[in-house]
């Protein structure tokens, strides 16, 4: 019989219970025991929920207090020496790796000051992982039995799960060599494999019939030495337990060949993103191996088209027989919200198009029953699904003729600034009169509880528009005054009116819908609530002009208008799956183009259009990069190019490895770009010299509560000046300050500005 399988389930809880419990522990409000009890309760609830929805194969070890890759590092004793601090509990050591730690000395404890580990996007998703750090000295050993413990937890509750492990080749491929080490992480495979052997043995002996082992890098362009490692790894591991080798997010292409002949129990492929994967996998599948077919998207919130999915499942069954077929999510469903329940505010016509995590589990059960018992056994469900898909395709919400007509009139000239950078920057300097090493922030300032509560009260109609506007003006005034007092050169209004840098704009454009509780994990305890693009997008009215114009009216210093750029709005939303991403990006860009011109007319001479998601939007295969970058860059330029020469366009990029796309960033033709740099050990410095416009490499990590001293800021400036012309260098944090508290924000900025003043004296 065909079985249904989920590759991973959202861990944060229906109401973000994990986030709340974790942050309460960090702030000292609750104990470690209370945090771990909440985590255990969530795991049990999620296992039972999946079982109740009819899922046959339920995952374990997909849960994490912070990040599953960091869990593996912790379990394998891959803990950099700087985090092995005396007096820290195992749990606090774990969190120090993810967040960094700064603690003053006490009578019985030494001072602690360690930065967080490097955080990287998980493939092209919006989830972030902590990059493993290895060296010749790494002593791999099974230092935590988390995977076993959680399997036994579920077993005790009467649920036999399929434990999830990140495969050894993927783990080492995404790792980096520690500072001072010249080793290629993959060279450590012989040292790491015995740890996997030990863990797989323990899981098998405990009763795990199958183990899911994730090797998603097989959807990337891989060097031969990595491909060759699969034989070494799985000739060993495949003989220890029954492994389902899992791939997702893209096409296997020729990488599928390395799977042929491996002693594994089966292979999982994502056929949502790459339908050709089924044929690729079937071609290399062994005589008794299982094929797991990922037909239900783990990345998007649209209902599965049962007619299309059933055809794929039937093809797999006809090829290998029903006993060897699993119907699965395409990837972990970590990337989508928990449940549609409670989302009563969504237009019912639109809501019927969606399926969140719980609903995806039910979809898997329906498709599996159809495969086992025939379509007649679920006729009502199949007919309802077909009706929903048809209604969406034919709905006037999805297609707006005026938007399509405007798109048809876009010309190449609309993507070009009036003059080259050198001409523009001279005019901007004459107008703005900024000092050497101008200081600024990325946009947002700390959002206090009072701000969040007031915004929520306004949304619920508990205060009037006038009361809310007065509150926002007061917050803006306070932030502007603070920036003037600490000595920043280019100010921002602080964004107190904005809940999220994407949602805020989506709420002011047509074509989006929003959830009340549609949270997904971004990193650690950070959760986001992505908008959903359901139809053609356009801007009906100005979105940010009122706040920016007010902020500029109360200061003589330049005020930045703050916008989110097209690709980031697209990538950080759940996009449509019925039109190409480039169509959606251009629609968003046209709305932003109108906003940029309105800001300029309102007297805003510096306009920042943040594009942090540009890099993560790159296709996984390099052969597809040029096409993507062409339309992505066109969208940014369409949004920003209409301004006058003396209006300065800024942009911001974060969470990215820019070496691959630095030329593309240059082609955006922004006047100033700020980039996240602090978490990458300043490794971007080597490419900064190639950039010909102004640049602001991030000087401190806003994701960590640690406050660098003035001397550290100055050292960073000195290092950057060796690569960037001093009159092109801006000084700024590496990201917005929204999630930070005021004490560390104040300390960070004061230290940064003090270092800027020292640098001006030295380099003037």
From Swiss-Prot:
<feature type="binding site">
    <location>
        <position position="654"/>
    </location>
    <ligand>
        <name>Zn(2+)</name>
    </ligand>
</feature>
<dbReference type="InterPro" id="IPR006276">
    <property type="entry name" value="Cobalamin-indep_Met_synthase"/>
</dbReference>
<feature type="binding site">
    <location>
        <position position="19"/>
    </location>
    <ligand>
        <name>5-methyltetrahydropteroyltri-L-glutamate</name>
    </ligand>
</feature>
<dbReference type="GO" id="GO:0008270">
    <property type="term" value="F:zinc ion binding"/>
</dbReference>
<feature type="binding site">
    <location>
        <begin position="442"/>
        <end position="444"/>
    </location>
    <ligand>
        <name>L-methionine</name>
    </ligand>
</feature>
<comment type="similarity">
    <text>Belongs to the vitamin-B12 independent methionine synthase family.</text>
</comment>
<feature type="binding site">
    <location>
        <position position="495"/>
    </location>
    <ligand>
        <name>L-methionine</name>
    </ligand>
</feature>
<keyword id="KW-0486">Methionine biosynthesis</keyword>
<keyword id="KW-0489">Methyltransferase</keyword>
<comment type="function">
    <text>Catalyzes the transfer of a methyl group from 5-methyltetrahydrofolate to homocysteine resulting in methionine formation.</text>
</comment>
<keyword id="KW-0862">Zinc</keyword>
<feature type="binding site">
    <location>
        <position position="610"/>
    </location>
    <ligand>
        <name>L-homocysteine</name>
    </ligand>
</feature>
<keyword id="KW-0963">Cytoplasm</keyword>
<dbReference type="InterPro" id="IPR002629">
    <property type="entry name" value="Met_Synth_C/arc"/>
</dbReference>
<dbReference type="GO" id="GO:0032259">
    <property type="term" value="P:methylation"/>
</dbReference>
<dbReference type="GO" id="GO:0019280">
    <property type="term" value="P:L-methionine biosynthetic process from L-homoserine via O-acetyl-L-homoserine"/>
</dbReference>
<feature type="binding site">
    <location>
        <position position="676"/>
    </location>
    <ligand>
        <name>Zn(2+)</name>
    </ligand>
</feature>
<feature type="binding site">
    <location>
        <position position="523"/>
    </location>
    <ligand>
        <name>5-methyltetrahydropteroyltri-L-glutamate</name>
    </ligand>
</feature>
<protein>
    <recommendedName>
        <fullName>Probable 5-methyltetrahydropteroyltriglutamate--homocysteine methyltransferase</fullName>
        <ecNumber>2.1.1.14</ecNumber>
    </recommendedName>
</protein>
<feature type="modified residue" description="Phosphoserine">
    <location>
        <position position="182"/>
    </location>
</feature>
<comment type="pathway">
    <text>Amino-acid biosynthesis; L-methionine biosynthesis via de novo pathway; L-methionine from L-homocysteine (MetE route): step 1/1.</text>
</comment>
<feature type="binding site">
    <location>
        <position position="572"/>
    </location>
    <ligand>
        <name>5-methyltetrahydropteroyltri-L-glutamate</name>
    </ligand>
</feature>
<keyword id="KW-0028">Amino-acid biosynthesis</keyword>
<dbReference type="GO" id="GO:0005829">
    <property type="term" value="C:cytosol"/>
</dbReference>
<dbReference type="GO" id="GO:0005634">
    <property type="term" value="C:nucleus"/>
</dbReference>
<feature type="active site" description="Proton donor">
    <location>
        <position position="703"/>
    </location>
</feature>
<feature type="binding site">
    <location>
        <position position="495"/>
    </location>
    <ligand>
        <name>L-homocysteine</name>
    </ligand>
</feature>
<feature type="modified residue" description="Phosphothreonine">
    <location>
        <position position="441"/>
    </location>
</feature>
<feature type="binding site">
    <location>
        <position position="500"/>
    </location>
    <ligand>
        <name>5-methyltetrahydropteroyltri-L-glutamate</name>
    </ligand>
</feature>
<feature type="binding site">
    <location>
        <begin position="526"/>
        <end position="527"/>
    </location>
    <ligand>
        <name>5-methyltetrahydropteroyltri-L-glutamate</name>
    </ligand>
</feature>
<feature type="binding site">
    <location>
        <begin position="442"/>
        <end position="444"/>
    </location>
    <ligand>
        <name>L-homocysteine</name>
    </ligand>
</feature>
<keyword id="KW-0808">Transferase</keyword>
<dbReference type="Pfam" id="PF01717">
    <property type="entry name" value="Meth_synt_2"/>
</dbReference>
<keyword id="KW-0479">Metal-binding</keyword>
<feature type="binding site">
    <location>
        <position position="652"/>
    </location>
    <ligand>
        <name>Zn(2+)</name>
    </ligand>
</feature>
<dbReference type="InterPro" id="IPR038071">
    <property type="entry name" value="UROD/MetE-like_sf"/>
</dbReference>
<keyword id="KW-0539">Nucleus</keyword>
<keyword id="KW-0597">Phosphoprotein</keyword>
<dbReference type="GO" id="GO:0009086">
    <property type="term" value="P:methionine biosynthetic process"/>
</dbReference>
<feature type="binding site">
    <location>
        <position position="735"/>
    </location>
    <ligand>
        <name>Zn(2+)</name>
    </ligand>
</feature>
<dbReference type="Pfam" id="PF08267">
    <property type="entry name" value="Meth_synt_1"/>
</dbReference>
<feature type="binding site">
    <location>
        <position position="610"/>
    </location>
    <ligand>
        <name>L-methionine</name>
    </ligand>
</feature>
